[in-house]
Amino acid sequence: MNTPAQLSLPLYLPDDETFASFWPGDNSSLLAALQNVLRQEHSGYIYLWAREGAGRSHLLHAACAELSQRGDAVGYVPLDKRTWFVPEVLDGMEQLSLVCIDNIECIAGDELWEMAIFDLYNRILESGKTRLLITGDRPPRQLNLGLPDLASRLDWGQIYKLQPLSDEDKLQALQLRARLRGFELPEDVGRFLLKRLDREMRTLFMTLDQLDRASITAQRKLTIPFVKEILKL
């Protein structure tokens, strides 16, 4: 996605991680709140937390995509990759329409980054126009941050836990991803994947992509025997 989402960092966000490709499961209220913040013209803040692989980054990528398509300037900061850049990359981000900070747990104990996030948060409050979305692997008060004022700020907004998908929802999510890629995932094949593979969604989606490519190359439909052959199960 070569859009204003790369205004601040040389990152390319995945084109297929949009709201249309996100299966909500038990997260409908969270999704509605997130989209409401994106629709409003003034600032808003949401903190999402969940274990890794639950879809936190997907939702931030989707938010960036939605506002970028409207022509708004957005910034995405993946703190799990903070060694690629310096805290000063946050300078001026309060001028953007949307700032997404992913994996904030990664800076716990890093004084420079904690202060940079704290200062950005305050500038965004003063601007009154920038939407702020932050994700972590636990609630703000449990982040073990060295800066108490930052933990307090993070606790101010709307806080949502991203609920994990049930197996039925995972099947629906896989079938949705397949349809968006232009092919069908038979129910029996989907259930076979859930039974035999790691059920973490990122792994399942990567496997689905692998099977899609193999199916195209072999010009064969997805069946359980074909899946066993490709995945060596």
Curated annotation (Swiss-Prot):
Leader sequence segment: none
Keyword Isomerase: no
Pfam families listed in its UniProt record: Bac_DnaA (PF00308), Hda_lid (PF22688)
GO biological process: DNA replication initiation; negative regulation of DNA-templated DNA replication initiation
Keyword terms, alphabetized: DNA replication, DNA replication inhibitor
InterPro entries in the cross-refs: Chromosome_initiator_DnaA-like, DnaA_dom, Hda, Hda_Enterobact, Hda_lid, P-loop_NTPase
Similarity annotation: Belongs to the DnaA family. HdA subfamily.
NCBIfam families referenced in this protein's UniProt entry, alphabetically: DnaA_homol_Hda (TIGR03420), PRK08084.1 (NF005982)
Cited HAMAP family: Hda (MF_01158)
Quaternary organization: The active form seems to be an ADP-bound monomer. Forms the RIDA complex (regulatory inactivation of DnaA) of ATP-DnaA, ADP-Hda and the DNA-loaded beta sliding clamp (dnaN).
PANTHER family: CHROMOSOMAL REPLICATION INITIATOR PROTEIN DNAA, DNAA REGULATORY INACTIVATOR HDA
Chain's role: Mediates the interaction of DNA replication initiator protein DnaA with DNA polymerase subunit beta sliding clamp (dnaN). Stimulates hydrolysis of ATP-DnaA to ADP-DnaA, rendering DnaA inactive for reinitiation, a process called regulatory inhibition of DnaA or RIDA.
Protein's UniProt name: DnaA regulatory inactivator Hda
